[in-house]
A protein has these predicted regions:
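Positively charged n-region of N-terminal signal peptides that target proteins for export
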Residues: 1-4
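Sec-dependent N-terminal signal peptides
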Residues: 6-8
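C-terminal motif of bacterial Sec signal peptides marking the signal peptidase cleavage site
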Residues: 14-15
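Acidic, metal/ion-coordinating pockets
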Residues: 19-222
Length: 222
């Protein structure tokens, strides 16, 4: 917007002079080329929040092919909107716990589903929800490992306390903005966490502490 406003004023100013068209074009081109984000930084950040990315049994069956699973058309009608956002944040409400792939009530989606999510333009995932432990310790850890393999930032579940301490609150930086992202769940359908794994449960004392830590990161929003 700052670039646009500057150029509009410049064009109006030059149109009121008696300079030749060539001279006007030369000045406009020179000044336009000299503008940079360091002088006029981007002041807009587009955020998209989506939930819940799930796979019920019917969806898993529909994606099955002779060689695996194909989700390439899953986001066809929304992919453009997803990619318009600078940060497209989604709640991954399934585990990637491996075979057998199952829907409700204990979800485990094919790995190809995560690939499709990534290819659609989602670039941040939150993983703390009531299905985080549908495949227990192995499902939680495998889900994290697969997300990490795609280098997608994520928040909510952790292999151990050391990982949580290093990665949480999740600091996102884009277009000169800094955002601290927090994620919690009310529960995991009665399935207990197996140490040393961590699921961020709603706990006001812990949340208050996390908020203070996020403030120390000096974000523009949290």
């Amino acid at each position: 917007m700052r670039h646009t406003l500057f150029l509009m004023i410049l064009l109006l100013s030059l149109s009121c002079t008696s300079r030749s068209q060539a001279k006007r074009d030369s000045i406009i081109d020179t000044l336009s080329d000299s503008l940079s984000d360091s002088i006029f930084p981007t002041d807009t950040l587009r955020l998209l929040f989506v939930g819940d990315l799930m796979q019920h049994q019917g969806q898993i069956n529909a994606a099955r092919t002779s060689t695996g699973y194909d989700y390439s058309t899953c986001f066809t009608y929304v992919k453009e909107e997803i990619k318009k956002a600078d940060l497209s944040i989604a709640n991954l409400e399934v585990t990637l716990g491996g075979k057998p792939y199952k829907g409700y009530p204990a979800f485990s989606a094919p790995d190809e589903f995560l690939t499709a999510i990534h290819d659609a333009g989602f670039n941040v995932l939150v993983t703390a929800n009531n299905h985080s432990l549908d495949r227990g310790k192995s499902g939680l850890e495998r889900t994290i490992q697969l997300i990490d393999s795609l280098k997608v930032p994520h928040a909510g579940t952790y292999i151990n306390a050391d990982e949580r301490e290093k990665k949480y609150p999740l600091l996102l930086e884009k277009n000169g903005f800094r955002i601290a992202l927090l994620n919690y769940t009310y529960g995991t359908n009665g399935i207990p966490v197996t140490p040393p794994n961590i699921v961020n449960y709603i706990d006001t004392a812990i949340i208050a502490k996390d908020i203070e830590e996020s403030k120390a990161m000096k974000p523009d929003a949290s």
